[in-house]
């Protein structure tokens, strides 16, 4: 590899991983060119406006706050969202009874014991591991939550090991301005926007990145685009990537979680930060998050893909689910959708975040360790093995670690203190 301090590094993608890598390299004195296909930075962390209030279309929480680097770096007080949240559980259009709520809590508390036997054998799907709960009326809701809602993929396609390794049990924090606005401000650094990488030539001693704005050269490149984009061949590599890297990319497909914001002129008797769930439901909702004037809805997995290119169908689904939970009269106080996320159809991402199917959990580590020619490094939420896969905190750490790998090739290379 040529000298990164002389010839620089090209970072592809100005999401959280790319921003973190670029800031780290620049702090160490490495000439760094950060390019981004979109006209903005932040990647899958982007905050929209709903009636003058923030609504995150993508990343919404700073998960596992006790070990999330963005919590440590925050320059503002963060909201403890767990302390605010209450849960409203319905069954067949009515509030769950105390006995049903007790059964619901018991079902949740038994999940670890149910999946424990399967964890010791060959990897299987989360759905198969939860089969022992079949017959429990709360099993469908638990399966929906852990699969489609949290992992963005249905439980029959989600590997048990990947689910187990990436359970987010720590506290959650939220910046008042929204996660997207927060990272765009906190991690802001120079980037060339509307500059998609189309071809990466790593056949020589350095790299040449072909873009619509011309060829950009460097000693090495950090690739932070989604596995969905990589698997779709939107970015050509010359020569082709090693087979192990290709297998890792295809072994980490993109799931889909779609969010919808429905403004309301009537609080419907619901306190702020009320989580709405239904035992037979297809969606979950957060009513009036942090006192804001909208309801945020979440749908993941196959249902999300099924309406990915049809916003009207997505809104119809959300309204029908709310009718199930709150009754038809409640919909009179709910306005038309203000925003619907479109990660599944956005060519810059082709999904929300990556998951591993049965047998593929270790592909995250393969992608993170890949270092073709000592001049290509891959970073992003998919390349985490520490339980932070699929999170902005994980993406940040991945970007920093990718930068550190390149810096380590330089005798005496090191990191500026804030980037650890």
What is the meaning of each model-derived region?
Residues 1-420:
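FAD-dinucleotide binding site
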């Amino acid at each position: 590899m040529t000298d990164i301090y002389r010839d620089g590094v090209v970072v592809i993608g100005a999401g959280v991983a790319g921003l973190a890598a670029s800031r780290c390299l620049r702090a160490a004195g490495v000439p760094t060119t950060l390019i981004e296909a979109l006209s903005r930075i932040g990647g899958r962390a982007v905050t929209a406006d709903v009636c003058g209030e923030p609504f995150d279309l993508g990343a919404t929480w700073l998960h596992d706050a006790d070990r999330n680097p963005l919590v440590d770096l925050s320059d503002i007080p963060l909201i403890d969202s767990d302390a605010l949240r209450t849960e409203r559980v319905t069954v067949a259009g009515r509030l769950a009874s105390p006995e049903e709520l007790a059964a619901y809590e018991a079902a949740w508390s038994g999940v670890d014991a149910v999946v424990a036997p399967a964890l010791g054998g060959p990897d299987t799907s989360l759905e198969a591991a939860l089969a022992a709960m079949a017959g429990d009326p709360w099993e469908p809701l638990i399966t929906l939550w852990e699969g489609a809602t949290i992992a963005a993929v249905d439980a029959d396609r989600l590997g048990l090991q990947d689910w187990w390794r990436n359970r987010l049990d720590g506290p959650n924090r939220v910046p008042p301005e929204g996660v997207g606005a927060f990272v765009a401000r906190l991690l802001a650094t120079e980037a060339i926007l509307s500059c998609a990488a189309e071809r990466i030539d790593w056949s020589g001693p350095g790299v040449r990145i072909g873009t619509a704005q011309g060829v950009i050269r460097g000693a090495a490149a950090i690739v932070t685009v989604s596995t969905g984009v990589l698997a779709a061949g939107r970015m050509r590599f010359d020569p082709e990537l090693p087979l192990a890297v290709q297998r890792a990319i295809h072994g980490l497909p993109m799931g889909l979680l779609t969010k919808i914001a429905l403004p309301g002129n009537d609080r419907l008797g619901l306190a702020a930060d009320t989580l709405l769930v239904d035992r037979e439901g297809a969606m979950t909702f957060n009513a009036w998050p942090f006192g804001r004037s909208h309801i945020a809805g979440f749908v993941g997995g196959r249902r999300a893909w099924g309406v990915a290119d049809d916003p009207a169908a997505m809104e119809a689904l959300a309204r029908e689910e709310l009718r199930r939970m709150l009754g038809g009269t409640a919909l009179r106080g709910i306005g038309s959708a203000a925003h619907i996320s479109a990660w599944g159809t956005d060519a810059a991402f082709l999904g929300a975040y990556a998951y591993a199917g049965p047998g593929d959990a270790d592909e995250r580590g393969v992608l993170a360790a890949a270092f073709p020619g000592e001049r290509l490094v891959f970073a992003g939420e998919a390349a985490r093995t520490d339980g932070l896969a699929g999170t902005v905190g994980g993406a940040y750490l991945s970007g920093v670690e990718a930068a550190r790998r390149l810096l380590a090739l330089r005798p005496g290379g090191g990191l500026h203190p804030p980037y650890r």
